[in-house]
From Swiss-Prot:
Residues 21-335 form the Protein kinase domain. Its EC number is 2.7.11.22, 2.7.11.23. InterPro entries: CDK (IPR050108), Kinase-like_dom_sf (IPR011009), Prot_kinase_dom (IPR000719), Protein_kinase_ATP_BS (IPR017441), Ser/Thr_kinase_AS (IPR008271). One of its GO terms (biological process) is imaginal disc-derived leg segmentation. It comes from the Eukaryota. The active site is at 151 (proton acceptor). Residues 342-454 are annotated as: Disordered. One of its GO terms (cellular component) is mediator complex. This is Cyclin-dependent kinase 8. It comes from Drosophila melanogaster. It is found in: Nucleus. It holds the Pfam family Pkinase.
Length: 454
């Protein structure tokens, strides 16, 4: 390309920083880049936008895919791509999209945190219904246009704040989305592992090669259950590490602990799954004989005879061929009973959820990630030290018992001394239980933060 022409084009090209104020207004980081809250410089209407800066140098395949899809997709419940900015100096790419003040990850987190203060814990029932209906509406539009989202999770379900589209759901992050208008081509050959583990359908975990729209429906079922209970239904401790092997033992174990082990009559094609042999080798049906979705939801005060449970059951059928479609789900009786779903999921009520916080330093989030990793390493080291100390104490106690058996008998012969000994044992057991509970809570919080950014 002629150098003079290149320089002239570069000067004439519209720059994102010339049109928008966004410096110091970073609001988050997604899978593919940073997100900024932006406003037009030349207008005073106060309308807010989101600028998604794609990581890397230039256009990656995932960025090209997201741009190509968003330019074609137009629906009220799918995020709108307004404009694309290319910076040739530093090879940065910016997507100008709708700005949503909230998302389901933060909304559910807000209600889960309320448990500590004994306030209202669950998301209001009417709001759950409105959220679910709009998610289904958006996914029905995608599926009708031969698009699989493939990475549905609470962090990718945005909710608009105050404004013209108040309380409207926007499905975002189309970087994993795929066209499936050529069903003979194995989609698994492109990306063997997609969708965050907690929301991944069982057929994906068993290596299905020709998966369908049903994977998005399963993820919606997981989100629905999480909205009803404020807890991820298939929470798994193991970190989400992208690999070429789709099989994930711990995630399958978690699903079976909630749903029970699938019966052959309920999922006839399970024997055709590539990882079926591994499944039969690793799991026993009898282990999960007392597990069921009804029991799990009943523990969270969702009755098995409720219409909400009946719809959830259809969304979370193990057999993808029997799983309900988005169109069928929208016609379910759950949406016919009061309260009816509303366009504003907040139903005109004040919004209780805090607005997104600014990250004034561009590297602040990366630093927080490093800090979190350092904290995790320190906690692991502390745990190892505690375990070593406990082992040393046990060894010392064992040596004392072996060296002084007679003295031990004398010390324990008195009633008062025996009570002191038992009291010490109880204190040690209580301390160990407290440490275990703290470790479990710490691991859960780490998983929540990890799942949000992946």
């Amino acid at each position: 390309m002629d150098y003079d022409f290149k320089m002239k084009t570069q000067i004439e090209r519209t720059k994102v920083e010339d049109l928008f104020n966004y410096e110091g207004c970073k609001v988050g980081r997604g899978t593919y880049g940073h997100v900024y809250k932006a406003k037009w410089k030349e207008t005073s209407d106060g309308k807010e936008y989101a600028l998604k800066q794609i990581d890397g140098t230039g256009l990656s395949m995932s960025a090209c895919r997201e741009i190509a899809l968003l330019r074609e997709l137009k629906h009220q419940n799918v995020i709108t791509l307004i404009r694309v900015f290319l910076s040739h100096n530093d090879r940065k790419v910016f997507l100008l999209i709708d700005y949503a003040e909230h998302d389901l990850w933060h909304i559910i987190k807000f209600h889960r945190a309320a448990k500590a203060t004994k306030k209202q814990v669950v998301v209001p029932r009417g709001m759950v219904k409105s959220l679910l209906y709009q998610i289904l509406d958006g996914i029905h539009y995608l599926h009708s246009n031969w698009v699989l989202h493939r990475d549905l999770k609470p962090a990718n379900i945005l909710v608009m704040g105050d404004g013209n589209e108040r309380g409207r759901v926007k499905i975002a992050d189309m970087g994993f989305a795929r066209l499936f208008n050529a069903p003979l081509k194995p989609l698994a050959d492109l990306d063997p592992v997609v969708v965050t583990f907690w929301y991944r359908a069982p057929e994906l975990l068993l290596g299905a090669r020709h998966y369908t729209k049903a994977i998005d429906i399963w993820a919606i079922g997981c989100i629905f259950a999480e909205l009803l209970t404020s807890e991820p239904i298939f929470h798994c401790r193991q970190e989400d590490i992208k690999t070429s092997n789709p099989y994930h033992h711990d995630q399958l174990d978690r699903i079976f602990n909630v749903m029970g082990f699938p019966q052959d009559k309920d999922w006839e094609d399970i024997k055709k799954m590539p990882e079926h042999h591994t499944l039969t080798k690793d799991f026993k049906r009898s282990t999960y004989s007392t597990c069921s979705l009804a029991k799990y939801m009943e523990r969270h005060k969702i009755k098995p005879d409720s219409k909400a449970f009946h719809l959830l059951q259809k969304l979370l059928l193990m057999d993808p061929n029997k799983r309900i479609t988005s169109e069928q789900a929208m016609q379910d009786q759950y949406f016919q009973e009061e309260p009816q779903p509303t366009q504003d999921v907040f139903a005109g009520c004040p919004i209780p959820y805090p607005k997104r916080e600014f990250l004034t330093d561009d590297d602040q989030e990366d630093k927080s990630d490093n800090k979190r990793q350092q904290q995790q390493q320190q906690q692991q080291q502390q745990q190892q030290q505690q375990q070593q100390q406990q082992q040393q104490q046990q060894q010392q106690q064992q040596q004392q018992m072996n060296a002084e058996p007679n003295a031990k008998r004398v010390r324990l012969s008195g009633a008062g001394n025996q009570q002191d000994f038992h009291h010490q044992q109880q204190q040690q057991q209580q301390q160990q239980q407290q440490q275990q509970q703290q470790q479990q809570q710490m691991m859960f919080n780490q998983q929540q933060n990890f799942q949000r950014f992946n």
